[in-house]
UniProtKB/Swiss-Prot annotation:
Protein's organism: Homo sapiens
Described function: Capable of hydrolyzing lactones and a number of aromatic carboxylic acid esters. Has antioxidant activity. Is not associated with high density lipoprotein. Prevents LDL lipid peroxidation, reverses the oxidation of mildly oxidized LDL, and inhibits the ability of MM-LDL to induce monocyte chemotaxis.
Protein name: Serum paraoxonase/arylesterase 2
MF terms in GO: acyl-L-homoserine-lactone lactonohydrolase activity; arylesterase activity; metal ion binding; protein homodimerization activity
Upper lineage: Eukaryota, Metazoa, Chordata, Craniata, Vertebrata
Protein EC: 3.1.1.2, 3.1.1.81
Matching Pfam families: Arylesterase
Reaction catalyzed: a phenyl acetate + H2O = a phenol + acetate + H(+); an N-acyl-L-homoserine lactone + H2O = an N-acyl-L-homoserine + H(+)
Compartments in which it is found: Membrane
Disulfide bridge positions per record: C42-C352
Tissue specificity: Widely expressed with highest expression in liver, lung, placenta, testis and heart.
Residues holding Ca(2+) 1: E53, N167, N223, D268, N269
Gene3D superfamilies: TolB, C-terminal domain
Length: 354
């Protein structure tokens, strides 16, 4: 009798494990292949060889790139090279990427930038917020951009127990931001277990020098985050749920969910066209290829444009898609004055004229 019980329990456990594995494959879109959608005027950006995970563009056309992300479980084309911040002036006739100098005293050797966001203060001071994973830990670095010197002055490192697994950030003040935690845990094994069991413990945190609080939760894996041009709404990408959440921002900085847009791809970073309010999304058609890297079958890329997200039927357009032959693992797409920049987790970056 005891053996029958043991065999029965083992069978139940194996069935549950199998069901979770199948569910994870579905969340990763492991069987999906993408059909190419080409743009006619594109070229790879020289100097970006090992990823440009996030991009943010100032109103004057200066674009910031976070490059060189290393992440447990992800491939890297430059595993021994520290990350950095590059800048490109999109108003130039032939824009090129230049690395920004960072002030002395900042630990460049362990710099591992992830999501980024800019904020322009009332006195026109530009702040750059960078999610950083030094030695795979979690901090938010706040810099002052000094345009005349093409440099970043490090102002502050933010660490907090409510920021255990930071992915992306959107700045709403000189030392104020919303950030996504893609996991509840910081330990790599517990992160994997959390993902495997589909616990939906990821969240969004509001940070200010005087208050830190969870303002939205229940996400599978909260990823990209951004704010509408009128500052009324926060958009959050839930990458493994294939969703974009629209949340209303209140005066106390709390968030209330208004709607969820379901998509058929893994949504990564979100960029906003300030002139139209359109959301541009860097997507992963097949997430399994990201984590099990095969140079003969590389991860594909996909860029979506979402118009009128607050309406009953938003318009979703595939602007660009590639099977990995040109661009692998697109994570962000940002537009400025008819120009499109597409960044990746660990591959190249693309410049296109629309």
């Amino acid at each position: 009798m005891g053996r029958l019980v043991a065999v029965g329990l083992l069978g139940i456990a194996l069935a549950l494990l199998g069901e979770r594995l199948l569910a994870l494959r579905n969340r990763l879109k492991a069987s999906r292949e993408v059909e190419s959608v080409d743009l006619p005027h594109c070229h790879l950006i020289k100097g970006i060889e090992a990823g440009s995970e996030d991009i943010d563009i100032l109103p004057n056309g200066l674009a910031f790139f976070s490059v060189g992300l290393k992440f447990p479980g992800l491939h890297s084309f430059a595993p021994d090279k520290p990350g950095g911040i590059l800048m490109m002036d999109l108003k130039e006739e032939k824009p090129r990427a230049r690395e920004l100098r960072i002030s002395r005293g900042f630990d460049l050797a362990s710099f591992n930038p992830h999501g980024i966001s800019t904020f322009i203060d009332n006195d026109d001071t530009v702040y750059l917020f960078v999610v950083n994973h030094p030695e795979f830990k979690n901090t938010v670095e706040i810099f002052k951009f000094e345009e005349a010197e093409n440099s970043l002055l490090h102002l502050k490192t933010v660490k907090h127990e409510l920021l255990p697994s930071v992915n992306d950030i959107t700045a709403v003040g000189p030392a104020h931001f919303y950030a996504t935690n893609d996991h509840y845990f910081s330990d790599p094994f517990l992160k994997y277990l959390e993902t495997y069991l589909n616990l939906h413990w990821a969240n969004v945190v509001y940070y200010s020098p005087n208050e830190v609080k969870v303002v939205a939760e229940g996400f599978d894996s909260a990823n990209g985050i951004n704010i509408s041009p009128d500052d009324k709404y926060i958009y959050v990408a839930d990458i493994l749920a294939h969703e974009i959440h629209v949340l209303e921002k209140h005066t106390n900085m709390n968030l209330t969910q208004l709607k969820v847009l379901e998509l058929d791809t893994l949504v990564d970073n979100l960029s906003i066209d300030p002139s139209s309010g359109d959301i541009w999304v860097g997507c992963h058609p097949n997430g399994q290829k990201l984590f099990v890297y095969d140079p003969n079958n590389p991860p594909s890329s996909e860029v979506l444009r979402i118009q009128n997200i607050l309406s009953e039927k938003p318009t979703v357009t595939t602007v660009y898609a590639n099977n990995g032959s040109v661009l692998q693992g697109s994570s962000v797409a940002s537009v400025y004055d008819g120009k499109l920049l597409i960044g990746t987790l660990y591959h190249r970056a693309l410049y296109c004229e629309l």
